[in-house]
């Protein structure tokens, strides 16, 4: 295809200018547009569909899909998208079936907050934002399969989000197999064994004698999706629960309103059941080490012991978890969280006293404030515990630095060897006893010494002595002693908490669950899905002392009957009045599984077509047969389904951890083929922008700064000197660069090339529009290699230059290797080197005497295509490529013989300093290299007649002469 382009009305009408580039790009995007108008370019059929070629290997590449904000994309957003587009085009040329989809993560709090501020419904603003994002992405020319596009707010999508949630609700984690199983199997086991269990009231009953509510409550303690009570940050004024990060000194970050801590029953996910697998299976995937570390730390597996301390006057012991049971002899006091039941009972005995006052104050502090506070606060409970190793009576305190959500909510304090315990003991004059002697760290009593060492002061007259033992051996001996006395046991603990999955907001997926008058919960059937979000004119939060989600206002929707709601009649008679759940799912819900829906987005019968999922997600290691395996085999198959997942490192923990959890549950229950969702993960760096900083480190908006001279900037209003720095692009700093503006000035191909040429993909780097001109000029030179700027005719050398041919082969090889490594900047550098070498001398009368031949230009255009597709397609059309661009083309082959240098440069060192450089044959032997070196004029001058003691020759590398 070679339709005419607009002619520039100057002496070089076919010069590659911004206007020429823009017209060319739009032309090719229009040419590639599908007949239905819904996309352009690449449409990848699934197995069984017309056009599918099962003989090809598959490549599934995925971008972390964007949250479409009203501001649109800035130049930082397309960085990862550009890299994935390059590798997808490369893989297509290499003969792969390529799946590269795009969609929209559209539910969530930002859209709802924007809607409340503007008075425009979030559905309206979100769809408008999606339209703008889609327009921008299409203008880049990315090779997305737009036939697979969806948004998480589409009812046809969130129907299956609700279905997966119901799957979790109807499942439990079997610790014996470490796999999820249907909850119905567990209920059958309880019925068969007539299992005895404790009711919520504390009494014990058997399954056969239990009421339906008691049975349900017992099963709820096993479900993967369950109702649990969590202490939350409730802001009555804002009418919502706030994250810990949104609370500062007991007030909301937004508005400064009072926040109080209160228990709230909410839907949870039992992600902690998967802690070991989430941790261990990180070894199965090709992920950045930094991300593995972040997830490892977040899960926080720690090995230690649970120890039971008797408490005077209490029936039940006080249980603590410690990773250092070897320090038991140094426990001189106990600390429990203000929310601990032991404290609750103590407060009841001390109503209105100092303890009650302290507990009320501490409970209203967020977990982050409690952990971050440098000042140690606490209050004695009046209770005494008994140290089982020493027999000493030790006081029990409550303090806000101990959290109920971690471990048992209680600690044994060993102030000699823990910094926080030492500060607390110093503040309240509590005993400090050294029990570990650490090499190189003498205990002076002025600060804690932490680490491993040998036990001291750790023996009792009864049965336990660990004095002189190193930490590892001492821990083992203490645990054995605890177990022999039935006062403790070995335990593995986790920092990971169960996942709070309820939100008191409107703009999210409704829960497919209802409640009867007694508060029993019932799932709705799959046939009743999707449970759609009702239209609501007033979706603002309700100001209240108790949480009332916005959906509670939709009374016609919330109050219904079991039959109308879609509850199975075997669970509840159809006429029974029920109330729908009014909380909604968090923004994470839709992003936990979207990569699976892309495999078959139009399948109305399955959340993902089993055949399509198996093809795109399951593959063998090491290439070979392209036939899709029928089942996962750990010995031969990749553990992760998506071949390449690219996105920001800010999602290294939560999104990726939640997606892995959902995927493992689906794997256990037979719905997906691999144990991990993502095989290879890559985090692109952030593209920042220039900002300006005052002397006090505060930032000044870009448009409030004047440049006086090169590198000197002042604040326009005050004349104060400011320093240029880099910062994240933001509206407040007015340093956001809109890609629409850059494309208008230079074209999309230049924009894409510059994004990749700025530096390593994984590195953060500042955007500078001034620097983009270099990349634009490179494309101009590439264009002039093939096109006469006056006539538009094809320019090609009559004969091949062997040096250019050799360099072309080396470039083909290097660019391919660099793309696989996602080293796009070095690949572009190789392309620039090739173009510079092939560029004709200025004023050459006969262009056929220089440049590249027609065949060389064709190969060059094909390796340029992944990086600058529009100009490459235009060059291809002028070279006679049939069809629409290079979509049906192949990656050019390279001759291995031409990748080897005929000559190599070898440095010659004399007395350790380089004195000369030799150009010798790559096949030269050591004696030949030695003779050449000794005959070199610069070497002769450096030796200056001195006797040569030794010559060391490393063939192909260096010569070292000692005189």
Predicted regions and their residues:
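Long, charged, mostly alpha-helical binding arms that flank functional sites
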Residues: 15-19, 120, 124, 301-306, ...
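Flexible, glycine/threonine-enriched loop-and-boundary segments that flank and lead into catalytic domains
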Residues: 290-319, 363-392, 396, 499, ...
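Catalytic alpha/beta core of large soluble enzyme barrels
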Residues: 84-85, 97, 340-444, 452, ...
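N-terminal catalytic cores of NTP/NDP-binding nucleotidyl/phosphoryl-transfer enzymes
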Residues: 47-122, 126, 150-161, 322-323, ...
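Helix-rich, typically C-terminal accessory recognition domains appended to large enzymatic cores
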Residues: 105, 176-180, 221, 226-233, ...
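Residue patterns forming the tRNA-binding/recognition surfaces of aminoacyl-tRNA synthetases
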Residues: 2-21, 25-40, 117-318, 325, ...
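Basic, alpha-helical terminal appendages of large translation-related enzymes
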Residues: 1-35, 46-54, 337-340, 349-352, ...
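Conserved oxyanion/phosphate-binding beta-strand-loop segments in alpha/beta enzyme cores
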Residues: 2, 11-62, 92-101, 125-131, ...
């Amino acid at each position: 295809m070679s339709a005419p382009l607009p002619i520039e009305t100057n002496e070089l009408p076919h010069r590659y200018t911004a206007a020429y580039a823009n017209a060319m790009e739009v032309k090719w995007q229009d040419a590639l547009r599908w007949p239905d108008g819904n996309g352009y370019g690449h449409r990848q059929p699934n197995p069984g569909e017309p056009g599918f070629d099962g003989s090809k290997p598959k490549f599934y590449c995925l971008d972390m899909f964007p949250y479409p904000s009203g501001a649109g994309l800035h130049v930082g957003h397309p960085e990862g998208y550009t890299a994935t587009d390059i590798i997808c085009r490369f893989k297509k040329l290499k003969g792969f079936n390529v799946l590269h989809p795009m969609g929209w993560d559209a539910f969530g709090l930002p859209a709802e907050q924007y809607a409340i501020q503007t008075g425009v419904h979030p559905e309206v603003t979100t769809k408008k934002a999606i339209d703008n994002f889609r327009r921008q992405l299409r203008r880049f020319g990315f090779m997305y399969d737009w036939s697979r596009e969806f948004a998480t707010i589409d009812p046809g999508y969130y129907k299956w989000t609700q279905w997966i949630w119901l799957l979790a609700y109807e499942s439990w984690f079997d610790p014996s197999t470490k796999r999820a199983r249907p909850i119905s199997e567990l209920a059958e086991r309880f019925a068969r064994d007539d299992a005895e269990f404790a009711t919520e009231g504390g009494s014990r009953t058997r399954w056969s004698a239990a009421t339906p509510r008691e049975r349900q409550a017992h099963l709820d303690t096993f479900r993967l999706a369950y109702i649990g009570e969590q202490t939350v940050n409730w802001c009555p004024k804002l009418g919502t629960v706030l994250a810990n990060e949104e609370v500062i000194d007991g007030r909301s970050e937004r508005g400064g309103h009072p926040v109080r801590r209160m228990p709230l029953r909410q839907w949870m996910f039992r992600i902690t059941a998967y802690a070991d697998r989430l941790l261990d299976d990180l070894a199965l995937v090709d992920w950045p080490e930094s991300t593995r570390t972040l997830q490892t730390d977040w899960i926080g597996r720690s090995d230690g012991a649970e120890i039971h301390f008797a408490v005077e006057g209490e029936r039940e012991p006080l249980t603590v978890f410690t990773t250092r049971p070897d320090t038991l002899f140094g426990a001189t006091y106990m600390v429990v969280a203000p929310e601990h039941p032991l404290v609750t009972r103590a407060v009841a005995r001390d109503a209105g006293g100092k303890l009650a006052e302290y507990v009320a104050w501490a409970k209203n502090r967020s977990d982050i404030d409690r952990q971050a506070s440098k000042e140690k606060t606490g209050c004695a409970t009046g209770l005494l515990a008994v140290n089982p190793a020493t027999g000493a009576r030790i006081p029990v305190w409550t303090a806000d630095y101990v959290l109920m959500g971690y471990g048992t909510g209680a600690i044994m304090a060993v102030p000699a060897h823990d910094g926080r315990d030492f500060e607390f003991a110093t503040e309240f004059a509590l005993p400090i006893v050294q029990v570990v002697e650490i090499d190189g760290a003498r205990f002076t009593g002025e600060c804690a010494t932490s680490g491993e060492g040998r036990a001291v002061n750790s023996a009792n007259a009864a049965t336990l002595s660990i004095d002189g033992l190193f930490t590892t051996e001492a821990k083992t001996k203490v645990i054995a002693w605890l177990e022999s006395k039935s006062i403790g046991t070995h335990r593995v603990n986790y920092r990971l908490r169960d996942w709070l999955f309820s939100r008191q907001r409107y703009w999210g997926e409704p829960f497919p669950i209802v409640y009867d008058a007694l508060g029993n919960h019932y799932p709705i059937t799959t046939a009743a899905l999707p449970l759609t979000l009702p239209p609501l004119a007033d979706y603002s939060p309700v100001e209240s002392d108790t949480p009332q989600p916005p959906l509670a206002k939709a009374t016609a929707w919330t109050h219904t009957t079991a039959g109308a709601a879609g509850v199975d009649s075997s669970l509840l008679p159809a006429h029974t009045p029920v109330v729908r759940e009014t909380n909604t799912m968090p923004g994470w819900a839709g992003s936990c599984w979207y990569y699976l829906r892309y495999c078959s987005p139009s399948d109305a019968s399955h959340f993902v077509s089993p055949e399509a999922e198996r093809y795109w997600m399951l593959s063998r290691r090491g290439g070979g047969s392209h036939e899709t395996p029928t089942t996962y085999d750990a010995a031969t198959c990749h553990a992760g389904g998506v071949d390449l997942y690219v996105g920001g490192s800010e999602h290294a923990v939560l999104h990726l951890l939640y997606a892995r959890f959902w995927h493992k549950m689906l794997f256990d229950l037979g719905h997906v083929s691999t144990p991990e969702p993502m095989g290879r993960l890559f985090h692109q760096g952030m593209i920042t922008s220039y900002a300006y900083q005052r002397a006090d480190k505060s930032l000044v908006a870009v448009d409030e700064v004047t440049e006086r001279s090169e590198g000197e900037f002042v604040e326009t209003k005050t004349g104060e000197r400011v320093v240029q720095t880099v910062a994240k692009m933001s509206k407040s700093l007015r340093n956001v660069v809109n890609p629409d503006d850059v494309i208008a000035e230079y074209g999309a191909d230049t924009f894409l090339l510059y994004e990749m040429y700025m530096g390593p993909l994984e590195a953060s780097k500042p955007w500078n529009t001034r620097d983009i001109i270099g990349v634009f000029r490179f494309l101009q030179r590439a264009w002039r290699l093939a096109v006469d700027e006056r006539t538009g005719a094809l320019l090609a050398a009559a004969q091949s230059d062997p040096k250019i041919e050799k360099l072309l082969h080396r470039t083909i090889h290097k660019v391919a290797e660099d793309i696989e490594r996602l080293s796009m900047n070095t690949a572009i550098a190789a392309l620039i080197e090739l173009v510079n070498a092939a560029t004709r001398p200025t004023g050459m009368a006969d262009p056929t005497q220089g440049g590249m031949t027609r065949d060389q230009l064709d190969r060059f255009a094909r390796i340029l295509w992944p990086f600058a597709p529009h100009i490459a397609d235009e060059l291809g059309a002028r070279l006679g490529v049939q069809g629409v661009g290079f979509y049906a083309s192949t990656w050019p082959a390279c001759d291995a013989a031409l990748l080897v240098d005929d000559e190599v440069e070898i440095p010659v060192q004399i007395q350790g300093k380089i004195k000369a450089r030799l150009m010798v044959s790559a096949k030269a032997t050591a004696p030949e290299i030695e003779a050449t070196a000794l005959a070199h004029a610069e070497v002769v001058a450096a030796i200056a007649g001195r006797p040569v003691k030794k010559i060391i020759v490393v063939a192909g590398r260096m010569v070292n002469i000692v005189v």
